[in-house]
């Protein structure tokens, strides 16, 4: 089985494609990667983000898709609208499971998606999702609604599904 991780590179391997590769390996799955951005971070500090160009993103896609049968995709950090739209053009025709793990902020506080790209994320990436797995913070950002006794996680998950995801699982 071949799974493709699309996301950012975390040099500490605590998140991003490096973390996905570790998980895939544990499950005896062949992991493939497309890097959307390179981050400078570790377990305590966030430095910066350098997104890849549209050309290198497309080149990575063509290299993978021309050589491997992809059985599933996990999308993490997408960072900006150019990356989102390029991915959408490549992914929209595929008929394979896509897991979307929205990546908005690092655990050390760094922003991992441009605020201006959140609308495009909702328009182009969420509808591709077989399942989307936001945490509480990400779900609240995507829906612009605070989770509370009135707006339960179940209600917020339904709001996200109405954006196009087949399933939504919020981890609190």
Regions found by a protein language model. Give the residues of each.
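Conserved N-terminal subdomain of the carbohydrate kinase-like
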Residues: 2-5, 25-100, 104-107, 111
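Glycine/serine-rich anion-binding loops at beta->alpha junctions
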Residues: 3-25
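Aromatic/hydrophobic pocket-lining residues that form π-stacking "cages" and hydrophobic walls in ligand
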Residues: 20, 87, 172
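Active-site glycine-centered loops adjacent to acidic/histidine catalytic or metal-binding residues
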Residues: 8, 101, 135
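Alpha-helical segments flanking ligand/cofactor-binding loops in enzyme cores
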Residues: 21-22, 85, 123, 158
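Conserved phosphate/ATP/ADP-binding segment of small-molecule kinases
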Residues: 115-171
